[in-house]
Amino acid sequence: MRTTFLLLCFATSISAQTWRFAVAGDSRNCGDVVMPAIAAGAKADHAAFYWHLGDFRALYKLDEDMVREAKTPFTILSYQSAAWPDFIRYQLQPFAPIPIFLGIGNHEMVQHTRGDYVMQFGDWLTRPEIVRQRLADDANDHVVRPYYHWIQGGVDFITMDNASQDMFDFPQVAWVRRILARDAADPQVKTVVVGMHAALPHSLGCDHSMNESAQGEYSGSRVYQELLRFRETSNKKVYVLASHSHFLVRDAYDSAYWRAHGGVLPGIIIGTAGAIRYRLPDTTQGFPPERAQTDVYGYLMGIVDPDGTITFDFHEIGRSAIPADIVARYGADGVDWCFNENKDTTSHLSSVCAAADAPAGPAQRP
């Protein structure tokens, strides 16, 4: 009885405290330069964990940081075999001992399958928190998947898989519906945070999102509506995080479409962990820098209050934050390239979003 009482007191004290976690996605191209600085920031901020929303390495081309560090030139085969181990060594290991949770991005599917992903990253997909939650949901479920969830500090963190245009599939949609039903009935769960690679459809970044395929638009809209329904019926908090687009956009679902079709969920696009920086979409024209900015690296620090409210602060990683050993490894000119030249000047236009929203279905892109 005394042991039970002490455990209850400990759980109560933890749930009554403010705590933090770090999250960002898209660390290809220059992630080996940027991610160690994110790791240092997460440690300094006392983050309980780091959540990576996908796209670890480019895979369709050579990552510039790997080319810079290589002692001999890569072949296609040698690069492909080295890319994921490079990510683990240079991007994940600096976080130790902070736990890391991984989400799958579309670049993880380049020359690979989900089976390859599960084999390479099984150590992270079978973290005790994940396995314990999977078996609590279904004692007979012994399948390791790219999508999973875990409950921590009164928050259900749901990692979804939309890394290919056939996602979400029906089993994954059914799975998230079951989770939300349990969360609605669980008084210990105050908040749901859904993380994924591509943003759900009809966001301010919809030209590079689940709008890009018919299945993505249909299934992503279903999940969005399920989250709206969960929030309305349970009076619990919901936040949606994504990356895929390599910039920062807050209030990403405060779009004309969702204002007219059910409501706006709090959402942030945070694809700023080292990938080539995209131009902001014209849907963000006139936004202040705190709401939309590009040509920056950094991460979100989620600050969880005792009532389940989460405040997301953007922590920018500047050139001066890159650790000295990283500068020595890649050279000052290599680090400077990541900050000055790692940019894509392609425009992101709302006319493409309008085509995607048309009754005929999403537009085909070259």
For each of these PLM feature ranges, what is it?
Residues 18, 46-47, 97, 187-191, ...:
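A general structural motif
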